[in-house]
Each structure stands twice: as C-alpha cells, then as structure tokens.
Amino acid sequence: QNWPRPQIPP
C-alpha cells in the first residue's frame, strides 16, 4: 500500500 508521506517542513 502506498500512502502519501507526512509533510516535513524544511
């Protein structure tokens, strides 16, 4: 299963 990765701030 492919789920979107959590958005990590730069």
UniProtKB/Swiss-Prot annotation:
This peptide both inhibits the activity of the angiotensin-converting enzyme (ACE) and enhances the action of bradykinin by inhibiting the peptidases that inactivate it. It acts as an indirect hypotensive agent. Bradykinin-potentiating peptide 10b-F has much lower activity than the full-length peptide. The keyword Secreted applies. Belongs to the bradykinin-potentiating peptide family. The keyword Secreted applies. Expressed by the venom gland. Keywords: Hypotensive agent, Metalloenzyme inhibitor, Metalloprotease inhibitor, Protease inhibitor, Pyrrolidone carboxylic acid, Secreted, Toxin. It comes from the Eukaryota. It comes from Bothrops jararaca (Jararaca). The modification Pyrrolidone carboxylic acid is found at Q1. This is Bradykinin-potentiating peptide 10b. GO terms for biological process: regulation of blood pressure. Its main location: secreted. GO terms for cellular component: extracellular region. Signal peptide: none annotated. Bradykinin-potentiating peptide 10b-F is present only in female snakes. One of its GO terms (molecular function) is toxin activity. It is found in: Secreted.
